Amino acid sequence: MKKDLLSIYDLEAGDFKAIFEKARHLKSVHEQGVAYTPLKGKTLGMIFDKSSTRTRISFEVGMYQLGGLALFLSNRDTQLGRGETVADSARIMSRYLNGIMIRTFSHLIIEEFAAHATIPVINGLTDLLHPCQILSDLFTIIEKKGSYERLKIVYVGDGNNIANSWINAAARLPFHLALSCPEGYDPDSGILDRGVKEAKEGVSLMRDPYEAVRNADVVYTDVWASMGQEAEQEARARVFRPYQINEALLSPAKKDAIVMHCLPAHRGEEITAAVLDGPRSVIIDQAENRLHVQKAILEILI
């Protein structure tokens, strides 16, 4: 693997296999209650400009279970919040730490940090991309379906960082990705154009969610308004209402289709409680797998 994991595009075919095999091993070891501490003596810095539940807990617990230490750093805890340059912070933290995970708004910040750091930098989430989530989702699909190859994976909702990262994944791996977003809420145009050109099994964007979901193996959604878009919540709710994942919208999907959501979910908005808690939903396993996949990433990179 490359030094950093900022995007799915940082991974080659062999890297996906290595991460998923390592995650499978780490999950088995965890379930057996066997101590496995390859990162003993190693420290991960975790920089958070955005609040988090799953990202913080999974990385912090993951480092602990691997024998290492995780340091939580908000923008109030570092000189980054007081005017120190990203480049200076990256160089200095590289002397203290063995790796950095960053959850921030601008993707440019994490790219600049990685350019000046001499230690691995992991993208815990930016407004543009969320690679760790998609890797965990792919691992979950392998567990539930045996493989993601040749499947039809459908994303319904806002063209946000999750949608962008799914497009990146479809350009690297052999599955068909269909996206359904309201007009004006499409994924990043540059990412979409590249994904359409490079996709192994095809990337398609359509307005009709029922047509998108037809014969789907996996149906995926996310919140309609991401962090920082709270002022748009009411307007977005009106636009996105036809894109709610409910029993009617799932009817064109395959009978054994699974439903995924990266969480947190707004029940009754992008997805109904009946579907979220229903037999097709794999959201709890999906959330758990953030821990195992990110542990695999940490062990490989650090």
UniProtKB/Swiss-Prot annotation:
GO CC terms, sorted: cytoplasm
Q: Does the keyword Cytoplasm apply?
A: yes
Pathway this chain belongs to: Amino-acid biosynthesis; L-arginine biosynthesis; L-arginine from L-ornithine and carbamoyl phosphate: step 1/3
Reactions the enzyme catalyzes: carbamoyl phosphate + L-ornithine = L-citrulline + phosphate + H(+)
Note the SS bond partners: none
**Which InterPro entries does UniProt cross-reference here?**
Asp/Orn_carbamoyltranf_P-bd (IPR006132), Asp/Orn_carbamoylTrfase (IPR006130), Asp/Orn_carbamoylTrfase_sf (IPR036901), Asp_carbamoyltransf_Asp/Orn-bd (IPR006131), Orn/put_carbamltrans (IPR002292), OTCase_ArgI (IPR024904)
Pfam families, per database record: OTCace (PF00185), OTCace_N (PF02729)
The principal localisation class reads cytoplasm
Gene Ontology BP annotations: arginine biosynthetic process via ornithine; citrulline biosynthetic process; L-arginine biosynthetic process
Task: Name its cellular compartments.
Answer: Cytoplasm
Q: Where does carbamoyl phosphate bind?
A: 52-55, 79, 103, 130-133, 262-263, 290
Q: Which residues bind L-ornithine?
A: 161, 222, 226-227
Give the top-rank taxon of the lineage listed in the UniProt record for this protein: Bacteria
Stated EC number for the protein is 2.1.3.3
**MF term (GO), any:** amino acid binding
Q: Which NCBIfam families did the record assign?
A: orni_carb_tr (TIGR00658), PRK00779.1 (NF001986)
Q: What is this protein called?
A: Ornithine carbamoyltransferase
| Source species | Syntrophus aciditrophicus (strain SB)
| Source species taxonomy | Bacteria, Pseudomonadati, Thermodesulfobacteriota, Syntrophia, Syntrophales
